[in-house]
C-alpha cells in the first residue's frame, strides 16, 4: 500500500517520500523512468489493489526482503521495492528545486 511504499522509499533513500517526491514535477529523466516502471508493474497486478493491499516485508542487512505467500502481494512488494531501489540508485540526479512542482503526467 502507499504507506508501505513510502516506508521502503525512506529506508532506501533516507528521504521523506511525501515531502521529497510527492509533488516532484520532473517526470523526465531517471526519476520519471523509476515511477513509470513502478506504475507499469502495478498495472499488471491482478487480484490485489496496489494502493490499499498490505503485504509483508522486512529490512535485513540493509536490504528489503519481500516475504509473502500470495503471488499478487509478493509482486506488489517487488514493484514497490524496485522503485525504492531505483530512486536510491539515482539520488545523484535528485533536484530539490523540482520537489515543489506540480505532478506532470508521463
Curated annotation (Swiss-Prot):
Kindly give the SMART domains that the UniProt entry links to this protein. PA2c
Q: Where does the protein end up?
A: Secreted
**GO cellular component: a single term:** extracellular region
- The question of whether Secreted is a record keyword is answered with yes
* Keyword line: Antibiotic, Antimicrobial, Disulfide bond, Fungicide, Myotoxin, Neurotoxin, Postsynaptic neurotoxin, Secreted, Toxin
Q: Name one GO molecular function term.
A: calcium-dependent phospholipase A2 activity
- Where would one find the signal peptide in this protein? none
**Disulphide bridges, residue numbers:** 28-35, 34-86, 48-72, 66-77
Site (described: Hydrophobic membrane-disruption site (MDiS))? 103, 106
> What Pfam families does the record point to?
Phospholip_A2_1
Q: Specify the superkingdom.
A: Eukaryota
* Sites annotated Important residue of the cationic membrane-docking site (MDoS): 96
Record-annotated site: Cationic membrane-docking site (MDoS) = 15, 19, 104
Q: Which Gene3D superfamilies match?
A: Phospholipase A2 domain
What are its GO biological-process terms? arachidonate secretion; defense response to bacterium; defense response to fungus; killing of cells of another organism; lipid catabolic process; phospholipid metabolic process
The family database entries (InterPro entries) matched by this protein are listed as: PLipase_A2, PLipase_A2_Asp_AS, PLipase_A2_dom, PLipase_A2_dom_sf
The residue stretches assigned to a coiled coil in this entry are none
Q: Give a brief account of the tissues where this protein occurs.
A: Expressed by the venom gland.
Which coarse location class describes where this protein primarily resides? secreted
| Similarity comment | Belongs to the phospholipase A2 family. Group II subfamily. K49 sub-subfamily.
So what does this one do? Answer: Snake venom phospholipase A2 (PLA2) homolog that lacks enzymatic activity. Shows high myotoxin activities. Also shows neurotoxicity, since it induces muscle paralysis when tested on mouse phrenic-diaphragm preparations. Displays edema-inducing activities. Also displays antimicrobial activity against E.coli and C.albicans, as well as antitumoral activity against some human and mice cell lines. In addition, it is effective as parasiticidal agent against Leishmania infantum promastigotes and Trypanosoma cruzi epimastigotes.
Cite the PANTHER family for this sequence: BASIC PHOSPHOLIPASE A2 PA-11-LIKE (PTHR11716:SF101), PHOSPHOLIPASE A2 FAMILY MEMBER (PTHR11716)
- Assembly with partners or alone: Monomer, and homodimer; non-covalently linked. Also found as trimer, tetramer, and pentamer.
| Name of the protein | Basic phospholipase A2 homolog BmajPLA2-II
**Organism field:** Bothrops marajoensis
